[in-house]
Protein backbone atom coordinates (compact mmCIF):
# COMPACT_ATOMS: atom_id res chain seq x y z
CA UNK A 1 0.00 0.00 0.00
CA UNK A 2 1.45 3.35 -1.06
CA UNK A 3 1.18 6.14 1.46
CA UNK A 4 3.35 9.06 0.35
CA UNK A 5 4.26 11.74 2.88
CA UNK A 6 3.77 10.81 6.53
CA UNK A 7 2.53 12.92 9.41
CA UNK A 8 4.35 13.19 12.69
CA UNK A 9 1.72 10.98 14.31
CA UNK A 10 2.27 8.28 11.69
CA UNK A 11 6.02 8.44 12.28
CA UNK A 12 5.51 7.99 16.03
CA UNK A 13 3.01 5.20 15.43
CA UNK A 14 5.66 3.42 13.38
CA UNK A 15 8.15 3.72 16.24
CA UNK A 16 5.62 2.26 18.67
CA UNK A 17 4.96 -0.70 16.38
CA UNK A 18 8.57 -1.90 16.55
CA UNK A 19 10.73 -3.25 19.37
CA UNK A 20 14.39 -2.82 18.36
CA UNK A 21 17.09 -3.98 20.77
CA UNK A 22 18.32 -0.67 22.21
CA UNK A 23 20.80 -0.42 25.08
CA UNK A 24 21.29 2.84 26.97
CA UNK A 25 23.45 3.34 30.07
CA UNK A 26 23.59 -0.38 30.83
CA UNK A 27 19.90 -1.14 30.48
CA UNK A 28 17.62 -2.17 27.67
CA UNK A 29 15.12 0.42 26.44
CA UNK A 30 11.70 -1.20 26.18
CA UNK A 31 9.61 1.73 24.95
CA UNK A 32 11.62 4.21 22.90
CA UNK A 33 8.77 6.73 22.73
CA UNK A 34 8.56 6.91 26.54
CA UNK A 35 12.31 7.03 27.15
CA UNK A 36 13.13 10.55 28.45
CA UNK A 37 16.36 10.79 26.42
CA UNK A 38 14.48 10.24 23.16
CA UNK A 39 11.15 11.97 23.81
CA UNK A 40 12.09 15.46 22.67
CA UNK A 41 14.16 14.41 19.61
CA UNK A 42 11.19 12.27 18.52
CA UNK A 43 8.96 15.34 18.80
CA UNK A 44 11.39 17.37 16.69
CA UNK A 45 11.48 14.75 13.92
CA UNK A 46 7.68 14.42 14.07
CA UNK A 47 7.43 18.19 13.65
CA UNK A 48 9.47 17.94 10.43
CA UNK A 49 7.09 15.32 9.07
CA UNK A 50 4.12 17.52 9.98
CA UNK A 51 5.64 20.40 8.02
CA UNK A 52 5.11 18.33 4.86
CA UNK A 53 1.35 18.72 5.45
CA UNK A 54 1.45 22.39 6.44
CA UNK A 55 0.04 24.56 3.61
CA UNK A 56 2.84 27.07 4.28
CA UNK A 57 5.49 24.52 3.32
CA UNK A 58 3.89 21.63 1.44
CA UNK A 59 4.39 22.89 -2.11
CA UNK A 60 7.93 24.00 -1.27
CA UNK A 61 9.20 20.73 0.18
CA UNK A 62 7.11 18.01 -1.49
CA UNK A 63 5.97 17.14 -5.01
CA UNK A 64 3.65 14.76 -6.83
CA UNK A 65 5.50 11.59 -7.81
CA UNK A 66 5.01 10.94 -11.53
CA UNK A 67 5.31 7.19 -10.95
CA UNK A 68 2.68 6.80 -8.23
CA UNK A 69 0.61 9.98 -8.28
CA UNK A 70 1.23 10.40 -4.55
CA UNK A 71 2.80 13.40 -2.86
CA UNK A 72 6.35 12.59 -1.72
CA UNK A 73 9.29 14.44 -0.20
CA UNK A 74 11.58 16.48 -2.45
CA UNK A 75 14.43 14.37 -1.06
CA UNK A 76 13.23 11.64 -3.44
CA UNK A 77 13.33 13.91 -6.48
CA UNK A 78 15.93 12.90 -9.07
CA UNK A 79 17.05 16.34 -10.30
CA UNK A 80 16.94 16.86 -14.04
CA UNK A 81 17.32 20.66 -13.99
CA UNK A 82 18.48 23.56 -11.85
CA UNK A 83 14.85 24.03 -10.81
CA UNK A 84 14.80 20.49 -9.42
CA UNK A 85 17.99 21.16 -7.46
CA UNK A 86 16.46 24.31 -6.03
CA UNK A 87 13.32 22.38 -5.10
CA UNK A 88 15.47 19.97 -3.12
CA UNK A 89 17.37 22.89 -1.60
CA UNK A 90 14.04 24.32 -0.41
CA UNK A 91 13.44 21.15 1.60
CA UNK A 92 16.97 21.18 3.02
CA UNK A 93 16.57 24.82 4.03
CA UNK A 94 13.11 24.55 5.59
CA UNK A 95 14.04 21.54 7.71
CA UNK A 96 17.46 22.91 8.67
CA UNK A 97 15.95 26.21 9.79
CA UNK A 98 13.39 24.30 11.87
CA UNK A 99 16.29 22.73 13.78
CA UNK A 100 18.75 25.66 13.46
CA UNK A 101 21.01 23.32 11.49
CA UNK A 102 21.79 21.42 14.70
CA UNK A 103 20.39 18.05 13.61
CA UNK A 104 22.71 16.72 10.95
CA UNK A 105 20.89 13.48 10.20
CA UNK A 106 17.29 14.49 9.62
CA UNK A 107 15.40 12.15 7.24
CA UNK A 108 16.23 14.18 4.12
CA UNK A 109 19.95 13.37 4.33
CA UNK A 110 19.85 9.62 3.80
CA UNK A 111 16.81 9.85 1.55
CA UNK A 112 18.97 11.92 -0.81
CA UNK A 113 21.74 9.31 -0.50
CA UNK A 114 19.25 6.59 -1.44
CA UNK A 115 17.91 8.65 -4.33
CA UNK A 116 21.46 8.99 -5.68
CA UNK A 117 21.99 5.24 -5.37
CA UNK A 118 18.72 4.67 -7.21
CA UNK A 119 19.41 7.06 -10.05
CA UNK A 120 22.88 5.59 -10.62
CA UNK A 121 22.11 1.95 -9.86
CA UNK A 122 23.10 0.99 -13.42
CA UNK A 123 26.71 1.19 -12.21
CA UNK A 124 26.13 -2.12 -10.40
CA UNK A 125 24.63 -3.99 -13.34
CA UNK A 126 27.99 -5.14 -14.67
CA UNK A 127 28.69 -6.78 -11.31
CA UNK A 128 25.24 -8.18 -10.61
CA UNK A 129 22.03 -6.90 -12.26
CA UNK A 130 20.05 -8.04 -9.22
CA UNK A 131 21.94 -5.63 -6.97
CA UNK A 132 20.86 -2.73 -9.15
CA UNK A 133 17.26 -3.93 -9.14
CA UNK A 134 17.34 -4.35 -5.35
CA UNK A 135 18.41 -0.73 -4.89
CA UNK A 136 15.68 0.50 -7.23
CA UNK A 137 13.03 -1.51 -5.39
CA UNK A 138 14.28 -0.35 -1.99
CA UNK A 139 14.24 3.30 -3.07
CA UNK A 140 10.60 2.95 -4.11
CA UNK A 141 9.73 1.27 -0.82
CA UNK A 142 11.34 4.02 1.26
CA UNK A 143 9.92 6.78 -0.94
CA UNK A 144 6.37 5.44 -0.93
CA UNK A 145 6.38 4.90 2.85
CA UNK A 146 8.36 8.06 3.70
CA UNK A 147 10.75 6.16 5.94
CA UNK A 148 13.48 7.52 8.19
CA UNK A 149 16.87 5.82 7.76
CA UNK A 150 20.06 5.73 9.77
CA UNK A 151 23.37 4.50 8.40
CA UNK A 152 26.51 2.91 9.78
CA UNK A 153 29.44 2.99 7.39
CA UNK A 154 32.54 3.21 9.59
CA UNK A 155 34.36 0.32 11.24
CA UNK A 156 34.89 0.41 15.02
CA UNK A 157 38.12 2.10 16.08
CA UNK A 158 40.13 -1.02 16.88
CA UNK A 159 43.46 -1.47 15.12
CA UNK A 160 43.34 1.07 12.32
CA UNK A 161 46.78 0.07 11.08
CA UNK A 162 45.31 -3.16 9.72
CA UNK A 163 42.56 -3.96 7.19
CA UNK A 164 39.38 -5.73 8.26
CA UNK A 165 40.59 -9.23 7.49
CA UNK A 166 43.68 -8.77 9.71
CA UNK A 167 41.83 -7.72 12.88
CA UNK A 168 42.24 -10.01 15.90
CA UNK A 169 38.71 -11.34 15.48
CA UNK A 170 37.47 -12.12 11.98
CA UNK A 171 34.14 -10.50 12.77
CA UNK A 172 35.18 -7.41 14.69
CA UNK A 173 34.22 -5.49 11.56
CA UNK A 174 30.89 -6.28 9.94
CA UNK A 175 31.24 -9.14 7.49
CA UNK A 176 29.37 -12.01 5.88
CA UNK A 177 29.45 -15.30 7.80
CA UNK A 178 27.69 -17.44 5.22
CA UNK A 179 25.04 -17.62 2.54
CA UNK A 180 21.64 -19.23 3.07
CA UNK A 181 18.68 -19.75 0.72
CA UNK A 182 17.00 -16.79 2.45
CA UNK A 183 19.95 -14.40 2.30
CA UNK A 184 23.24 -13.45 3.94
CA UNK A 185 24.13 -14.01 7.60
CA UNK A 186 26.23 -11.06 8.80
CA UNK A 187 28.21 -10.56 12.00
CA UNK A 188 30.31 -7.77 13.48
CA UNK A 189 29.92 -4.06 14.12
CA UNK A 190 29.61 -0.73 12.34
CA UNK A 191 29.31 2.81 13.58
CA UNK A 192 28.33 5.71 13.79
CA UNK A 193 24.57 5.27 13.54
CA UNK A 194 23.14 8.68 14.39
CA UNK A 195 19.54 8.69 15.67
CA UNK A 196 19.38 4.90 15.17
CA UNK A 197 16.97 4.29 18.11
CA UNK A 198 14.29 6.51 16.56
CA UNK A 199 14.59 5.50 12.89
CA UNK A 200 12.75 2.95 10.76
CA UNK A 201 15.60 1.23 8.91
CA UNK A 202 19.38 1.11 8.66
CA UNK A 203 21.36 1.16 5.43
CA UNK A 204 24.94 -0.08 5.25
CA UNK A 205 27.03 1.06 2.29
CA UNK A 206 30.69 1.08 1.42
CA UNK A 207 33.50 3.62 1.22
CA UNK A 208 36.73 3.24 -0.76
CA UNK A 209 39.55 1.48 1.06
CA UNK A 210 38.82 -2.23 0.79
CA UNK A 211 41.86 -4.41 0.15
CA UNK A 212 42.22 -7.87 -1.42
CA UNK A 213 41.22 -10.26 1.34
CA UNK A 214 38.41 -7.96 2.50
CA UNK A 215 35.80 -9.63 0.27
CA UNK A 216 33.57 -10.80 3.13
CA UNK A 217 33.46 -7.21 4.44
CA UNK A 218 32.60 -5.69 1.05
CA UNK A 219 28.87 -5.72 1.68
CA UNK A 220 26.06 -3.20 1.35
CA UNK A 221 22.44 -3.74 2.38
CA UNK A 222 19.43 -2.32 4.24
CA UNK A 223 17.24 -3.88 6.93
CA UNK A 224 14.56 -2.77 9.42
CA UNK A 225 15.98 -1.35 12.63
CA UNK A 226 14.21 -4.06 14.66
CA UNK A 227 15.66 -6.99 12.70
CA UNK A 228 16.40 -9.89 15.10
CA UNK A 229 20.05 -10.00 16.12
CA UNK A 230 20.68 -6.29 15.55
CA UNK A 231 21.79 -4.62 18.78
CA UNK A 232 21.93 -0.81 19.17
CA UNK A 233 24.53 0.30 21.73
CA UNK A 234 23.96 4.00 22.51
CA UNK A 235 26.74 6.30 23.63
CA UNK A 236 26.44 8.15 26.93
CA UNK A 237 23.64 10.71 26.57
CA UNK A 238 24.56 14.38 26.51
CA UNK A 239 21.30 15.08 28.35
CA UNK A 240 18.97 12.87 30.37
CA UNK A 241 15.71 14.21 29.00
CA UNK A 242 14.63 15.74 32.30
CA UNK A 243 16.41 19.09 32.27
CA UNK A 244 14.18 22.16 31.81
CA UNK A 245 14.00 23.71 28.36
CA UNK A 246 14.67 27.10 29.97
CA UNK A 247 18.08 25.96 31.16
CA UNK A 248 19.06 23.95 28.09
CA UNK A 249 16.96 25.26 25.19
CA UNK A 250 19.01 23.49 22.50
CA UNK A 251 20.52 20.44 24.21
CA UNK A 252 17.13 19.34 25.53
CA UNK A 253 15.55 19.53 22.09
CA UNK A 254 18.04 18.59 19.42
CA UNK A 255 20.44 15.96 20.74
CA UNK A 256 21.11 13.27 18.13
CA UNK A 257 21.95 9.98 19.80
CA UNK A 258 24.85 8.11 18.19
CA UNK A 259 25.16 4.35 18.37
CA UNK A 260 27.35 1.36 17.62
CA UNK A 261 25.44 -1.30 15.71
CA UNK A 262 26.32 -4.90 16.58
CA UNK A 263 25.10 -7.57 14.17
CA UNK A 264 24.80 -10.96 15.87
CA UNK A 265 24.27 -13.36 12.94
CA UNK A 266 21.64 -11.12 11.37
CA UNK A 267 19.78 -12.37 8.30
CA UNK A 268 19.83 -9.97 5.35
CA UNK A 269 17.27 -11.11 2.74
CA UNK A 270 18.64 -11.43 -0.78
CA UNK A 271 16.35 -8.67 -2.06
CA UNK A 272 17.96 -6.26 0.43
CA UNK A 273 21.55 -6.99 -0.68
CA UNK A 274 23.17 -4.23 -2.77
CA UNK A 275 26.82 -5.39 -2.86
CA UNK A 276 28.40 -8.63 -1.71
CA UNK A 277 31.87 -10.18 -1.94
CA UNK A 278 33.17 -7.66 -4.47
CA UNK A 279 36.00 -5.35 -3.42
CA UNK A 280 36.02 -3.43 -6.70
CA UNK A 281 32.30 -2.62 -6.55
CA UNK A 282 32.59 -1.69 -2.87
CA UNK A 283 35.43 0.74 -3.58
CA UNK A 284 33.65 2.35 -6.53
CA UNK A 285 30.17 2.73 -5.02
CA UNK A 286 30.93 6.08 -3.40
CA UNK A 287 32.51 7.85 -6.40
CA UNK A 288 30.29 6.27 -9.07
CA UNK A 289 26.79 6.81 -7.68
CA UNK A 290 26.70 10.47 -6.70
CA UNK A 291 26.48 9.75 -2.97
CA UNK A 292 29.58 11.88 -2.50
CA UNK A 293 28.02 14.84 -4.27
CA UNK A 294 24.24 15.03 -3.98
CA UNK A 295 24.14 14.68 -0.16
CA UNK A 296 26.88 17.33 0.07
CA UNK A 297 24.23 19.77 -1.17
CA UNK A 298 22.08 18.91 1.85
CA UNK A 299 24.97 19.08 4.31
CA UNK A 300 26.12 22.36 2.79
CA UNK A 301 22.72 23.99 3.29
CA UNK A 302 22.46 22.61 6.81
CA UNK A 303 26.02 23.73 7.60
CA UNK A 304 25.29 27.22 6.33
CA UNK A 305 22.25 27.56 8.59
CA UNK A 306 24.14 26.15 11.58
CA UNK A 307 26.98 28.63 11.02
CA UNK A 308 24.52 31.47 10.50
CA UNK A 309 22.72 30.55 13.73
CA UNK A 310 25.95 30.53 15.75
CA UNK A 311 26.87 33.88 14.19
CA UNK A 312 23.50 35.40 15.07
CA UNK A 313 23.81 34.17 18.65
CA UNK A 314 27.29 35.73 18.87
CA UNK A 315 25.99 39.07 17.57
CA UNK A 316 23.07 39.11 20.01
CA UNK A 317 25.37 38.06 22.84
CA UNK A 318 27.74 40.93 22.15
CA UNK A 319 24.89 43.40 21.83
CA UNK A 320 23.21 42.25 25.05
CA UNK A 321 26.17 43.28 27.21
CA UNK A 322 27.30 46.22 25.11
CA UNK A 323 30.68 44.85 24.00
CA UNK A 324 30.00 45.21 20.29
CA UNK A 325 31.31 48.78 20.49
CA UNK A 326 34.86 47.46 20.77
CA UNK A 327 36.98 47.04 17.66
CA UNK A 328 38.23 43.54 18.49
CA UNK A 329 34.67 42.27 18.97
CA UNK A 330 33.53 43.94 15.75
CA UNK A 331 36.45 42.29 13.98
CA UNK A 332 35.48 38.84 15.26
CA UNK A 333 31.82 39.32 14.38
CA UNK A 334 32.72 40.66 10.95
CA UNK A 335 34.84 37.55 10.40
CA UNK A 336 31.87 35.31 11.22
CA UNK A 337 29.56 37.25 8.93
CA UNK A 338 32.04 36.92 6.08
CA UNK A 339 32.27 33.18 6.74
CA UNK A 340 28.50 32.89 6.40
CA UNK A 341 28.51 34.83 3.14
CA UNK A 342 31.40 32.73 1.76
CA UNK A 343 29.45 29.50 2.33
CA UNK A 344 26.31 31.09 0.90
CA UNK A 345 28.23 32.10 -2.24
CA UNK A 346 29.72 28.62 -2.63
CA UNK A 347 26.27 27.05 -2.44
CA UNK A 348 25.00 29.47 -5.07
CA UNK A 349 27.96 28.58 -7.27
CA UNK A 350 27.36 24.84 -6.80
CA UNK A 351 23.75 25.29 -7.91
CA UNK A 352 24.85 27.07 -11.08
CA UNK A 353 28.00 25.18 -12.08
CA UNK A 354 26.00 22.06 -12.83
CA UNK A 355 27.19 18.71 -14.08
CA UNK A 356 24.89 16.60 -16.25
CA UNK A 357 25.34 12.84 -16.15
CA UNK A 358 24.68 10.58 -19.17
CA UNK A 359 21.41 9.57 -17.46
CA UNK A 360 20.27 13.20 -17.55
CA UNK A 361 20.60 13.64 -13.80
CA UNK A 362 21.87 17.05 -12.76
CA UNK A 363 24.57 17.25 -10.10
CA UNK A 364 25.54 20.39 -8.17
CA UNK A 365 29.12 21.47 -8.83
CA UNK A 366 31.52 19.28 -6.89
CA UNK A 367 34.32 21.85 -6.54
CA UNK A 368 32.30 24.40 -4.51
CA UNK A 369 30.64 21.63 -2.49
CA UNK A 370 33.97 20.06 -1.60
CA UNK A 371 35.26 23.52 -0.75
CA UNK A 372 32.40 23.88 1.73
CA UNK A 373 33.30 20.50 3.18
CA UNK A 374 36.86 21.70 3.62
CA UNK A 375 35.97 25.08 5.13
CA UNK A 376 33.17 24.24 7.59
CA UNK A 377 35.43 22.10 9.83
CA UNK A 378 37.43 25.31 10.34
CA UNK A 379 34.71 27.96 10.24
CA UNK A 380 32.26 26.42 12.70
CA UNK A 381 34.87 25.82 15.44
CA UNK A 382 35.92 29.43 14.97
CA UNK A 383 32.32 30.56 15.52
CA UNK A 384 32.22 28.53 18.74
CA UNK A 385 35.50 30.12 19.83
CA UNK A 386 34.11 33.62 19.23
CA UNK A 387 31.05 32.75 21.34
CA UNK A 388 33.36 31.66 24.15
CA UNK A 389 35.45 34.82 23.89
CA UNK A 390 32.48 37.19 23.85
CA UNK A 391 30.56 35.41 26.60
CA UNK A 392 33.68 34.99 28.74
CA UNK A 393 32.95 34.45 32.44
CA UNK A 394 29.29 35.25 31.95
CA UNK A 395 28.82 31.87 30.29
CA UNK A 396 29.79 30.21 33.57
CA UNK A 397 27.49 32.27 35.78
CA UNK A 398 23.94 31.66 34.55
CA UNK A 399 21.28 30.97 37.18
CA UNK A 400 18.44 28.52 36.50
CA UNK A 401 14.86 29.06 35.48
CA UNK A 402 13.89 28.04 39.01
CA UNK A 403 15.80 31.04 40.36
CA UNK A 404 13.72 33.39 38.24
CA UNK A 405 10.53 31.66 39.37
CA UNK A 406 11.30 32.32 43.05
CA UNK A 407 9.76 35.68 44.14
CA UNK A 408 12.35 36.05 46.89
CA UNK A 409 15.11 36.21 44.27
CA UNK A 410 13.29 38.31 41.68
CA UNK A 411 14.96 41.63 42.51
CA UNK A 412 18.46 40.16 42.51
CA UNK A 413 17.82 38.31 39.26
CA UNK A 414 16.73 41.45 37.49
CA UNK A 415 19.39 43.73 38.97
CA UNK A 416 22.53 41.62 38.69
CA UNK A 417 21.81 39.60 35.56
CA UNK A 418 20.50 42.41 33.38
CA UNK A 419 22.50 43.46 30.36
CA UNK A 420 22.83 46.86 28.76
CA UNK A 421 19.91 49.29 29.01
CA UNK A 422 16.85 47.62 27.54
CA UNK A 423 18.01 44.01 28.13
CA UNK A 424 16.34 42.52 31.20
CA UNK A 425 17.83 39.87 33.45
CA UNK A 426 15.78 36.95 32.13
CA UNK A 427 16.36 37.93 28.51
CA UNK A 428 20.12 38.11 28.99
CA UNK A 429 20.30 34.81 30.87
CA UNK A 430 18.20 33.01 28.27
CA UNK A 431 20.52 34.32 25.57
CA UNK A 432 23.61 33.18 27.49
CA UNK A 433 22.06 29.74 27.99
CA UNK A 434 21.51 29.51 24.24
CA UNK A 435 25.17 30.34 23.72
CA UNK A 436 26.32 27.91 26.43
CA UNK A 437 24.47 25.03 24.82
CA UNK A 438 26.37 25.79 21.61
CA UNK A 439 29.84 26.42 22.99
CA UNK A 440 30.14 24.89 26.46
CA UNK A 441 27.71 22.03 27.01
CA UNK A 442 28.61 18.46 26.07
CA UNK A 443 25.87 18.86 23.47
CA UNK A 444 27.77 21.76 21.91
CA UNK A 445 31.07 19.89 21.97
CA UNK A 446 29.44 17.00 20.15
CA UNK A 447 28.20 19.48 17.52
CA UNK A 448 31.75 20.77 17.19
CA UNK A 449 33.23 17.30 16.77
CA UNK A 450 30.47 16.39 14.34
CA UNK A 451 31.21 19.36 12.11
CA UNK A 452 34.89 18.44 12.03
CA UNK A 453 34.41 14.81 11.06
CA UNK A 454 30.90 14.17 9.67
CA UNK A 455 32.29 13.87 6.15
CA UNK A 456 35.51 12.10 7.13
CA UNK A 457 39.00 13.19 8.10
CA UNK A 458 39.24 16.83 6.89
CA UNK A 459 42.98 16.51 6.22
CA UNK A 460 42.45 13.49 4.02
CA UNK A 461 39.51 15.17 2.29
CA UNK A 462 41.61 18.22 1.43
CA UNK A 463 44.41 16.00 0.12
CA UNK A 464 41.93 14.17 -2.12
CA UNK A 465 40.57 17.52 -3.28
CA UNK A 466 44.07 18.69 -4.19
CA UNK A 467 44.86 15.53 -6.13
CA UNK A 468 41.57 15.69 -8.04
CA UNK A 469 42.10 19.33 -8.96
CA UNK A 470 45.69 18.62 -10.00
CA UNK A 471 44.48 15.88 -12.35
CA UNK A 472 41.70 17.97 -13.86
CA UNK A 473 43.31 21.37 -14.23
CA UNK A 474 46.52 22.44 -15.91
CA UNK A 475 48.58 25.29 -14.50
CA UNK A 476 48.09 27.43 -17.59
CA UNK A 477 49.04 30.76 -16.06
CA UNK A 478 52.36 29.41 -14.79
CA UNK A 479 53.16 28.09 -18.27
CA UNK A 480 52.29 31.49 -19.76
CA UNK A 481 54.48 33.26 -17.21
CA UNK A 482 57.39 30.95 -17.93
CA UNK A 483 57.09 31.65 -21.65
CA UNK A 484 57.12 35.42 -21.25
CA UNK A 485 60.92 36.01 -21.16
CA UNK A 486 61.40 34.13 -24.42
CA UNK A 487 58.62 36.08 -26.08
CA UNK A 488 60.04 39.40 -24.89
CA UNK A 489 63.54 38.42 -26.04
CA UNK A 490 62.26 37.70 -29.53
CA UNK A 491 60.57 41.11 -29.69
CA UNK A 492 63.76 42.91 -28.61
CA UNK A 493 65.95 40.98 -31.05
CA UNK A 494 63.56 41.77 -33.86
UniProtKB/Swiss-Prot annotation:
Optimum pH is 9.0. Active from pH 5 to 11. FAD binds at residues 151-153, 157-160, 194, 457-460. Substrate binds at residues 105-109, 151, 207-208. InterPro entries: Acyl-CoA_Oxase/DH_mid-dom_sf (IPR046373), AcylCo_DH-like_C (IPR036250), AcylCoA_DH/oxidase_NM_dom_sf (IPR009100), HpaB/PvcC/4-BUDH (IPR004925), HpaB/PvcC/4-BUDH_C (IPR024719), HpaB/PvcC/4-BUDH_N (IPR024674). It comes from the Bacteria. It is an enzyme of class 1 (oxidoreductase). It catalyses: anthranilate + FADH2 + O2 = 3-hydroxyanthranilate + FAD + H2O + H(+); 4-hydroxyphenylacetate + FADH2 + O2 = 3,4-dihydroxyphenylacetate + FAD + H2O + H(+). The keyword Phosphoprotein does not apply. GO terms for biological process: catabolic process. Pfam families: HpaB, HpaB_N. Optimum temperature is 60 degrees Celsius. Active from 25 to 70 degrees Celsius. One of its GO terms (molecular function) is 4-hydroxyphenylacetate 3-monooxygenase activity. The keyword rRNA-binding does not apply. Its EC number is 1.14.14.8, 1.14.14.9. Utilizes FADH(2) supplied by NAD(P)H-dependent FAD/FMN reductase (GTNG_3158) to catalyze the hydroxylation of anthranilate producing 3-hydroxyanthranilate. Preferred substrate is anthranilate but it can also utilize 2-hydroxyphenylacetate, 4-hydroxyphenylacetate and salicylate but not kynurenine, phenol, 2-NBA, chlorobenzene, naphthalene, naphthol, toluene or ethylbenzene. Anthranilate 3-monooxygenase consists of a reductase component (GTNG_3158) and an oxygenase component HpaH. Belongs to the FADH(2)-utilizing monooxygenase family. This is Anthranilate 3-monooxygenase oxygenase component. The lineage of its organism: Bacteria, Bacillati, Bacillota, Bacilli, Bacillales.
Amino acid sequence: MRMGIRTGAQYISGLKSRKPEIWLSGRRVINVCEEPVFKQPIREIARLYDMQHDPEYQDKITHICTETGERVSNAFLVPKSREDLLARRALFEVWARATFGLMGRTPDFLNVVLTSLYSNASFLEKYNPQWAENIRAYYRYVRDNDLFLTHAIINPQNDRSKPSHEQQDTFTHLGVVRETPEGLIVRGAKMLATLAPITDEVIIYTFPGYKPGDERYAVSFAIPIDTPGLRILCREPMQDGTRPLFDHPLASRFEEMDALLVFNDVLVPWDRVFIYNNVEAANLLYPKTGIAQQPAHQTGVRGLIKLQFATEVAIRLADSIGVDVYLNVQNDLGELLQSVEAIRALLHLAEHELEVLPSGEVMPGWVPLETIRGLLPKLYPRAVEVLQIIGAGGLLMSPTGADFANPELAADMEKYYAGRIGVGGEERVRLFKLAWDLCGEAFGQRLLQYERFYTGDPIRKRAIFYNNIKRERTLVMVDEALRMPNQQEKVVNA
